[in-house]
């Protein structure tokens, strides 16, 4: 059976719309003709990767020489080569995200919030007086194995399967099929074992990214709070319901907790942004984002007269799904964005895209700094902006 290869490419700014197909399927990156050592599958994967990078990659000119490593006659590791040739500047990796995979099902499930998981999000810490580690639970997905045994935010994990946590076994907390956790507790400024153990079996489940939503009365005004962990497609309509509720409750400000949100689909990003923007901005169809592609594609779009702006709107569509967000415009005057190193991509985009039009105050540490979006391309060619 021939594997289907799937290539994720990142492009400057944060919204992908239409594109062009490449007329010359022969591509480049051909070998010297001294002899072919690759299988048909690997030959195709190299050629596919070269053609896609040569058409869509933002830094295609900067990595033109490196792309020759995707010689289909001799390169036996196209997946590794794509990672190796990603754009760098002064030997520092600028593009940390472009990747190629032959496991499309797992990648799509991950984007759609489906995972084989224990259902917790963990932060790793290290003891100052030893080489051992510990975990602190950041949050737990409702209905997950971790949720069912009572694990909650702030809990401490000190052992995995009866052993201290080290650099050699810490990944078992995430990537095993079952595990026994030795729980910890804090006493007198120190962390130690509590004596409690919990055993979990991983399950395949949808991880609902809407972690918490509630309204507080603060000094005579109503303030909403939304903790959100991923801009997946299934949560878009749920966000509309939540914003309708916030509107009904009369909130004037919103605490938007994106500390653990690494991004997701542009479609869902737009749904949320267009409901949080001032109503007059939405009705005036002001510019929300502008796409920047590589030089060749920018010239192509210019010749076609394509508009590369995304405008605020009361309707959000991605071609297959349309959501009316006009009724859910919350009417808030300020957003407090809770951010950290796990805040990336669509999360950063929402906050930055709203800043010209309303008060947005950022609270927390530095965000991840992923100022790019991506398209997914597979065979047969299918592009999904996220």
Where are these regions (language model features)?
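Sec-dependent N-terminal signal peptides
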Residues: 6-11
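C-terminal motif of bacterial Sec signal peptides marking the signal peptidase cleavage site
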Residues: 16-19
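Flexible, low-complexity junctional segments that flank or bridge functional domains
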Residues: 21-254, 262, 268, 278-281, ...
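Gly/Ser/Thr-rich loop/hinge elements
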Residues: 266-334, 376
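Positively charged n-region of N-terminal signal peptides that target proteins for export
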Residues: 1-4
């Amino acid at each position: 059976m021939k594997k289907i290869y799937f290539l994720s490419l990142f492009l400057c700014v944060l919204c992908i719309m239409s594109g062009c197909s490449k007329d010359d399927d022969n591509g480049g990156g051909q070998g010297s003709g001294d002899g072919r050592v690759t299988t048909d599958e690997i030959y195709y994967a190299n050629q596919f990767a070269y053609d896609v990078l040569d058409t869509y990659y933002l830094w295609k000119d900067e990595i033109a020489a490196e792309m020759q490593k995707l010689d289909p006659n001799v390169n036996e590791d196209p997946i590794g080569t794509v990672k190796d040739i990603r754009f760098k500047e002064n030997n520092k990796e600028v593009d940390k995200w472009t990747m190629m995979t032959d496991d499309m099902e797992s990648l799509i499930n991950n984007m759609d919030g489906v995972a084989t998981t224990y259902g917790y999000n963990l932060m790793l810490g290290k003891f100052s007086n030893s080489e051992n580690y510990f975990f602190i639970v950041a949050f737990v997905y409702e209905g997950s194995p971790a949720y069912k045994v009572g694990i909650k935010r702030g809990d401490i994990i000190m052992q995995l399967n009866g052993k201290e946590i080290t650099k050699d076994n810490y990944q078992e907390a995430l990537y095993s099929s079952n595990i026994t956790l030795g729980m910890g507790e804090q006493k007198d400024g120190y962390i130690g074992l509590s004596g409690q153990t919990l055993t979990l079996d991983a399950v395949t489940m949808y991880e609902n990214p809407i972690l918490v939503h509630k309204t507080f009365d603060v000094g005579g005004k109503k303030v909403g709070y939304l903790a959100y962990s991923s801009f997946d497609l299934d949560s878009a309509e749920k966000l509309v319901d939540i914003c309708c509720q916030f509107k009904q409750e009369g909130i004037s400000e919103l605490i938007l907790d994106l500390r653990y949100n690494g991004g997701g689909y542009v479609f869902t990003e737009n749904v949320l942004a267009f409901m949080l923007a001032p109503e007059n901005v939405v009705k005036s169809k002001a510019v929300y984002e502008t796409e920047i592609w590589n030089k060749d594609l920018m010239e192509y779009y210019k010749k076609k007269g394509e508009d590369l702006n995304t405008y605020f709107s009361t309707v959000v569509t991605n071609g297959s799904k349309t959501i009316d967000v006009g009724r859910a415009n919350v009417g808030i005057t300020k957003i407090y964005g809770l951010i950290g190193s796990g805040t990336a991509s669509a999360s950063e985009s929402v906050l930055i895209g709203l800043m010209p039009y309303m008060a947005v105050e950022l609270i927390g540490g530095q965000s991840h700094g992923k100022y790019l979006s991506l398209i997914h391309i597979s065979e047969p060619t299918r592009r999904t902006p996220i």
